[in-house]
């Protein structure tokens, strides 16, 4: 007979930061009686999820991938943004073997170098400085046909801010004497991660066939036309950009295609559409035989050269739990499932022994402000059942609402999202109390606490650099101040009576009173 477990649950409230300023602060304005009560009754503090504390450049806002890697690994992990920017500054980037091979193969075949990625200074999924370095390197190596397929942001940047980036790259190509912007499309289409293949297919057809809803002779003109159609950057319809002869640039046999996003979750689907021989997400009219390179590792089953392979993280929380014969559950909606599994496990796809996973489908709506509660009720039902089963030592759960609805810029919807999560937490805490369990409530980064850009007056759809909550609902304890996300895994191990491995440099934040 299996011994009943007294589970320790880590509840990650995605996009839930703390901000003193209450103006357009959806979390402050939401009615959250459960969290209010827990903060009044139990020890709590604020911890850091941004900048140097998570291995990002100083002042850089945190994000979900980075947050979960730090949460699960128990150490500050040097992030891809910093790593690649350093390689560019040190002139190592221009000698990267995978990138050089791709450019050289296209030149040798008489083909073109196609560069695609999120053209943004946001630093969450990509950085336009990396894309510029790639364009410069391609031309320096002798490429005369260099085509940029720009995915537009408006989510980790202000909703209408792409013009300066497009103008800069127009000027860059003029200076280089070769290359041009070949297409633009919003990230809503090109970077879907929820198996909405009808969106991804529009980006694929744009790049491979030049098939587009609109066609212009200049990228800035195309963007301005999109704004006239009331499309913000994120939602810009497929737009092919023609050359002086009215021709579009499409991916052909013998070309190279270099994907410049460094974050994996929103890069996987479109990558698979280009390289998987048995791909069945949508009908591909053409499948060019080309040299495809990814900037970083997107998934174990994606077989393509990688410019910057992942650094191997050992003795993450999941691995330590496995070694100690502990059971664990990972649970979230589609939107954050990769975060509580792949990213939390330090970039490992396969579950650890004793690790179960539950995926709840996110609602099929165009944007989550249309259903701010998302699938939180179903998620909570499954989570409560798992707690009551007493099968698990540790449960990792992510509620995506604060982040996913925060990204829409819709204040009223974000308030509803926060209220939905609060009600769910009440159910979870009650279930834990029944079985003698405990929980830590925290977040990976901020978002919903700032819904308007105080400078521009536009909707603030990006993450923030605010501190995030850290609450312990359990035994009588004290909590250290000044913590960061990498302190969470060591804290969990201490609470369940396991030793902290040497690889974890984080410190336990919770101290049980004797």
From Swiss-Prot:
Organism: Shewanella baltica (strain OS195)
InterPro entries assigned: Alkaline_phosphatase_core_sf, BPG-indep_PGM_N, Metalloenzyme, PGAM_B_sf, Pgm_bpd_ind
An annotated GO cellular component: cytosol
Any GO BP annotation: glucose catabolic process
Keywords: Glycolysis, Isomerase, Manganese, Metal-binding
Co-factor requirement: Mn(2+)
Catalytic residue list: 64 (phosphoserine intermediate)
Similarity field: Belongs to the BPG-independent phosphoglycerate mutase family.
Record: residues binding substrate: 125, 155-156, 187, 193, 263-266, 336
Residues at which Mn(2+) 1 binds: 403, 407, 463
Pfam name, any one: Metalloenzyme
Annotated protein name in UniProt: 2,3-bisphosphoglycerate-independent phosphoglycerate mutase
Catalytic activity annotation: (2R)-2-phosphoglycerate = (2R)-3-phosphoglycerate
Domain of life of the source: Bacteria
Gene name in the database record: gpmI
């Amino acid at each position: 007979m299996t011994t009943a477990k007294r589970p320790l649950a880590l509840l990650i409230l995605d996009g839930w930061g703390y901000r003193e300023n209450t103006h357009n602060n959806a979390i402050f304005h939401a009615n959250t009686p459960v969290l209010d009560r827990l903060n009044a009754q139990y020890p709590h503090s604020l911890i850091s999820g941004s900048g140097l504390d998570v291995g990002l450049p100083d002042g850089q806002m945190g994000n979900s991938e980075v947050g979960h890697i730090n949460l699960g690994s128990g150490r500050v992990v040097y992030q891809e943004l910093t790593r690649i920017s350093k390689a560019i500054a040190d002139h190592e980037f221009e000698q990267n073997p995978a990138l050089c091979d791709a450019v050289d193969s296209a030149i040798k075949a008489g083909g073109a170098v196609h560069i695609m990625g999120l053209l943004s200074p946001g630093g969450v999924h990509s950085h336009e400085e990396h894309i510029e370095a790639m364009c410069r390197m391609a031309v320096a190596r002798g490429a005369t046909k260099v085509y940029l397929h720009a995915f537009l942001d408006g989510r980790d940047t202000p909703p209408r801010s792409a013009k300066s980036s497009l103008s800069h790259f127009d000027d860059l190509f003029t200076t280089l004497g070769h290359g041009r912007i070949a297409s633009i499309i919003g990230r809503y289409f090109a970077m879907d991660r929820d198996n909405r293949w009808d969106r991804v297919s529009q980006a694929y057809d744009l790049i491979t066939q030049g098939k587009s809803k609109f066609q212009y002779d200049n990228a800035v003109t195309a963007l301005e036309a999109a704004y006239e159609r009331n499309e913000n950057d994120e939602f810009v319809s497929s737009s092919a950009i023609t050359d002086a002869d009215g021709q579009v640039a499409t991916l052909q046999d013998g070309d190279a295609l270099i994907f410049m996003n460094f974050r994996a979750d929103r890069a996987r689907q479109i990558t698979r559409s280009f390289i998987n021989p048995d791909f069945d997400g949508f009908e591909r009219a053409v499948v060019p035989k080309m040299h495809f390179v990814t900037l970083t590792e997107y998934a174990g089953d994606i077989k393509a050269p990688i410019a910057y392979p992942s650094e191997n993280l050992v003795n993450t929380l999941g691995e330590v739990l496995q070694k100690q014969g502990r059971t664990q559950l990972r649970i979230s909606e589609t939107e954050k499932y990769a975060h509580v599994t792949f990213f939390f496990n330090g970039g490992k796809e396969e579950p650890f022994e004793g690790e179960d996973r539950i995926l709840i489908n996110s609602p099929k709506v165009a944007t989550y402000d249309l259903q701010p509660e998302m699938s939180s009720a179903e998620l909570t039902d499954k989570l409560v059942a798992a707690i009551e089963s007493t099968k698990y030592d540790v449960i990792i759960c992510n509620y995506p609402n604060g982040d996913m609805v925060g990204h829409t810029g819709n204040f009223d919807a974000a308030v509803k999202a926060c209220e939905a999560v609060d009600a769910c937490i009440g159910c979870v805490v009650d279930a834990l109390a029944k079985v003698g369990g405990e929980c830590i409530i925290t977040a990976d980064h901020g978002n919903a606490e700032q819904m308007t850009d105080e400078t521009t007056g536009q909707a603030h759809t990006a993450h923030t650099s605010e501190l995030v909550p850290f609450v312990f609902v359990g035994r009588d304890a004290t909590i250290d101040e000044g913590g960061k996300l990498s302190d969470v895994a060591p804290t969990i191990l201490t609470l369940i009576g396991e030793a902290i491995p040497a690889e974890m440099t984080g410190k336990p934040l919770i101290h049980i009173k004797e």
